[in-house]
Amino acid sequence: RKQGDKMNYHTSDALALSVLIEEVAGMPLSDFFYQKLYSKFGKDGYMHWTADKMGTTVSFSELTMTAKDWANFGKYLMEEKKSKSCLGSFFNEGVNNAVDTGNKNGSKYGYQSWVFNVNGKPEMVLQGHGGQFMVLNETTDTILLIISMSARYKAGNLFSNIHKFAEKLN
């Protein structure tokens, strides 16, 4: 097939990006994310992103934050996209140039985010293992956040730090 015709998502692509950021920034992606992004929107003050045995951030999954911080992350991303900052321009370009995945749901993929048509307009969607979704609907200026868990999901102990998140419920 011709380059750019169809996207074949693979987690190793995201992992390669994590290794690249680690090399350029001189720190794990999780630390870079915390210092450069999370510190700007994180209100609860706790996030965790799993690393492999070599210390490389597992960039394709297991970024854990409170629901409030996930919503704040969505708001932050929408503000960045509107302001056309470097980060916002990156995601805008990804949405505008997203490549068809061939999935029956009509999804596309662009620059580390999924793109779905919502009411006829392409919108950025973050999707996680086990049933997490965040839809950034810029047309209505709303964020749809769904945090769920499939009982059949067997990708390690996602709840090893649940106590740190539960502390934020008071």
Predicted segment positions?
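Active-site Gly/Thr loop motif
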Residues: D44-M47, F91-S148, R152-Y153
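Non-transmembrane alpha-helical segments in soluble domains
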Residues: S18-E22, S30-Y34, Y38, A71-M78, ...
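Carbohydrate-binding/catalytic loop surfaces
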Residues: A51-M65, Y109-G120
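Catalytic-site signature segments of enzymes, centered on catalytic residues
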Residues: R1-S61
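Active-site-proximal alpha-helical segments within enzyme catalytic domains
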Residues: D13-L20, S59-S83, Q132-M149
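Short, gly/Ser/Thr-rich active-site loops of penicillin-recognizing serine hydrolases
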Residues: K154-N170
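A structural signal for well-ordered alpha-helical scaffolds and beta->alpha junctions
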Residues: D13-A14, S30, T66-W70, L87, ...
